[in-house]
Amino acid sequence: MSSSRSSRRQFLASGAAAAVSLGFPAITRSRSPNAKLNLVFIGVGGRGGGNLSSISGIPMALPKKGGDKDGAKAPPAPSASDAAENIVALCDVNAQNLDFAAKFHPGAQTFRDFRKLYDTLKASEIDGVVVSTTEHTHAYATLPALLMKKPVYCEKPLTHNVAEARLITKAA
């Protein structure tokens, strides 16, 4: 009589094989360019610049000119077409921050006032908004996006008082 019991090693091997075969289609599937999100960034200096770099996949720092001390050449700077997402608009009250970020995302519209940004862009052009402004403007920069029924990533704190929190809650 043969035993139907399997060893622990056989069990783990068959379990690992099943897990790999089930996950394989997700690993091999490539992302369609049409699947990119159209994002708006309000506040692109400091923390906002970090958020922009992280989400777009384009580091906002210039490569070393002439290579490093070992003679290796710096890699070419990524272009906006290499971005993980479509950056459709950049907004910052500081012109220097805005100009610097715009160099890395030349196709993005630029604004110095988020109210003009919301007045100019149509809801259909925006898939999401990232708010990284100074703390006292978070709620006011977030509210119009929520009224457009767009998802928002906002740095903390979202609000500074109960009245702002109630407005945001009602809009969401």
Model-derived regions: residue spans:
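N-terminal glycine-/serine-/threonine-rich beta1-alpha1-beta2 phosphate-ribose binding loop
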Residues: S2-P151, R166-K170
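ADP-ribose/adenylate-binding Rossmann-like module
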Residues: K149-N161
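Rossmann-fold NAD(P)-binding glycine/threonine-rich loop
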Residues: L158-A172
